Design a protein with these regions (language model features):
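N-terminal strand-loop-strand beta-hairpin
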Residues: 1-119, 153
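Short loop/beta submotifs within extracellular cysteine-rich repeat domains
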Residues: 28-29, 131, 141-144
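Short amphipathic alpha-helical surface patches that serve as generic macromolecular interface elements
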Residues: 89, 133, 144-147
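Acidic and generally charged, gly/proline-rich low-complexity regions
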Residues: 104, 135-138
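Acidic, contiguous internal or C-terminal segments within carbohydrate-active enzymes
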Residues: 125-135
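Mixed-charge, glycine-accented linear interaction segment located at domain edges/termini
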Residues: 139-155
């Protein structure tokens, strides 16, 4: 189990953040369309079933995360690793039902992921619901430094 340290915030446009990553030698590790279904079980835990669509292929992943619906920019929460379940959806649905997870909502987005050292940018252009979100996560000291730099640039 990992403890995630993340700044997450809404933005007007994602392009300046993509340009920031590219100009500062962040490596693009993924660009894909995603759908994510969120499930809650009343214990402040979310189950997330994420479908990544890359080059016409679909891969499905399951992970768990502490529920954190605050408006705070900084979020610190526990997060499991993810497991690929592309060929195991019958099992996943059975597991969610047995653990009393109920469907909460579905998200659709295009996600860009950039990484450099211990810092990862997840830049999301949501189609449903309509929104643009940037998340910066990783090592506390490095993430704090990058977030401070971004904040001072007034993107």
């Amino acid at each position: 189990m990992n403890k995630e340290y993340e700044y997450s915030f809404y933005v007007e446009e994602i392009e300046p953040f993509i340009q920031y990553c590219e100009k500062n030698n962040y490596r693009k590790i993924r660009e894909c369309n995603q759908t994510r279904e969120l499930y809650k079980n009343g214990n402040k835990i979310l189950a997330r079933v994420t479908k990544n669509y890359i080059d016409g292929n679909e891969k499905i992943f399951l992970d768990l995360k502490d529920e954190n619906e605050t408006e705070d920019t900084l979020k610190i929460c526990r997060e499991s690793g993810e497991i690929e379940v592309t060929n195991s959806m019958e099992f996943v649905n059975s597991l969610l039902e047995m653990m009393k997870f109920k469907f909460h909502k579905k998200l659709e987005r295009k996600r860009y992921v950039y990484e450099k050292g211990n810092v990862k940018f997840e830049i999301d252009d949501y189609k449903v619901p309509k929104a643009k979100v940037v998340a910066i996560e990783g090592d506390k000291l490095e993430v704090d430094k990058v977030y401070s730099e971004i904040k001072n640039r007034n993107f």
